[in-house]
Amino acid sequence: LGRMGQTLRDQVPAAGSTWGGWLPPGIHPDPRPPDEADVVVVGGGVVGWSVAYWLKMLEGRFRRHGMKVLVVERDPTYSRASTVLSVGGIRQQFSLPENIRMSRFSASFLRDINEHLGVPNEPPIDIQFQPSGYLFLASQEGAAKLEATVQLQRDEGAQVVLLSPTQLKEKFPWINTEDVAVASYGLEDEGWFDPWTLLNAFRRKATSLGVHNCCGEFCSWPCMCSWNKTLQVCAHPSQIYMPDSLEYQPVACSIVVNAAGAWAGKLLEADGLPGKLCQPPLPIQPRKRYVFSWHCPDGPGLSCPFLVDTSGAYFRRDGIAGNYLGGMSPPEEEEPDPSDLSVDHDYFQEQLWPRLARRVPSFESLRVRGAWAGYYDYNTFDRNGVLGPHPRLENLFLAAGFSGHGLQHSPAAGRAVAELVVRGRFESLDLRRLGWARLEDREPLHEGGVV
């Protein structure tokens, strides 16, 4: 206990200090970036680190000299990072085949995470996975759509069942089924896990493979219209702003991967690309989402799934002591100001709690414990990720816009982008439809399963 207490004291700021100089355990960025890199990954969230990891795993013919990969993250404390502020869910229940396939890939990856991300002489990785199906409820108006979506999920190999109101009540007697026409329930490869552990596992493994990382802000693109297939010549400098020294550090690179999450769209707008190269604009915006925590000793208990209500409200169990997490996305016209991560507690009282209590009567007596806010990297075009090369800057690749499911799809998305960079094509999963072309052609791939 004494050693544990000392460890905790070593990992938090001293009294009276600020969080500005504090770094999470295990996070030690290089003081300065290297002068050159084959690939610069902008964004050190879980998607960015997944890309970096897979680049090193797939470097193949470059293995003799090694592919030099640099990850640039402007906030090494991760205090505003979408990854660590997520509720950590993974599910197979999506409405787009590509998303289902990425979920299946990621579930397999997480199941064998120590084979993929284990580092010699370091403790085994425990992402604290809690297996529990997602439970989607549908009213009469949404029943046919849910049934069709479940058939698609089954066709893709997902284990999902449909439940009638009677079956739903038998399995989860604490649910009010009054307005429920049908429900879908995942039988495997669904649940939740610790986001920070996955992020740090990707980072530790990638750095053990030789990936560099620095704290800084990417400020300019290496504008060229064709990229060096050998990845050996790095003659196109980008600028990285170093907040500690207030200097700009040039980094010559061949390829840039934009994995900046909620700020991926703004990154393209702000960093000096000629006007024609910014068209069409990348439709990714930061959207603030609240997560509330509450205690209810008479709540659903251990049988609680990750429930998504007909109203859009969701909740899941948090441990085994009667605690729960939940939230709800607001309508478009009521989006909160994303300029900070303050929480509107009236939103819980006026919008979320009535919906929770209607579905689970015991939640009438819940007691709020806390709340936080995080960001979705929200794709306003179709709520799906954008993966692949820029149409006119072939050395610029995109991996952003997942609209809330980037964490769970990070193993698959990182592999996909790395395959494009190293091999010039998708190999593990065919994700061509998620490329930039759909933005230019104005052909959205709508995902109906965004929570």
Show where each model-derived region lies.
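Dinucleotide-binding Rossmann-like beta1-alpha1 core, especially the glycine-rich loop
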Residues: 87-171, 312-314
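Flavin (FAD/FMN) cofactor-binding core of flavoprotein oxidoreductases
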Residues: 154, 166-170, 192, 286-287, ...
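Helical element adjacent to the flavin cofactor pocket in flavoenzyme catalytic cores
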Residues: 185-255, 259
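Active-site lid/adjacent beta-loop-alpha segment flanking the redox-cofactor pocket in flavoenzymes
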Residues: 270, 277-283, 295-398
